[in-house]
């Protein structure tokens, strides 16, 4: 139902946020920012 859709969207957003945070961390560690 609707709750499943919302949960799926939140999971997708969470994955995107985690991915971008990891990218920023890698960037800082490699000094390439």
From Swiss-Prot:
Keyword DNA-binding belongs to the record: no
Subcellular location as annotated: Secreted
Cysteines engaged in disulfide bonds, as pairs: 27-33
Any GO BP annotation: defense response to bacterium
Keywords on record: Amphibian defense peptide, Antibiotic, Antimicrobial, Disulfide bond, Secreted
Entry-linked InterPro entries: Antimicrobial_frog_2
Record Pfam families: Antimicrobial_2
One Gene Ontology cellular component: extracellular region
Tissue specificity statement from the Swiss-Prot or TrEMBL entry: Expressed by the skin glands.
Main location: secreted
Signal sequence, renumbered to the chain: none
Protein task: Antimicrobial peptide. A mixture of Brevinin-2DYc/2DYd is active against the Gram-positive bacterium S.aureus (MIC=15 uM) and the Gram-negative bacterium E.coli (MIC=15 uM).
UniProt similarity note: Belongs to the frog skin active peptide (FSAP) family. Brevinin subfamily.
Protein name: Brevinin-2DYc
Organism: Rana dybowskii (Dybovsky's frog)
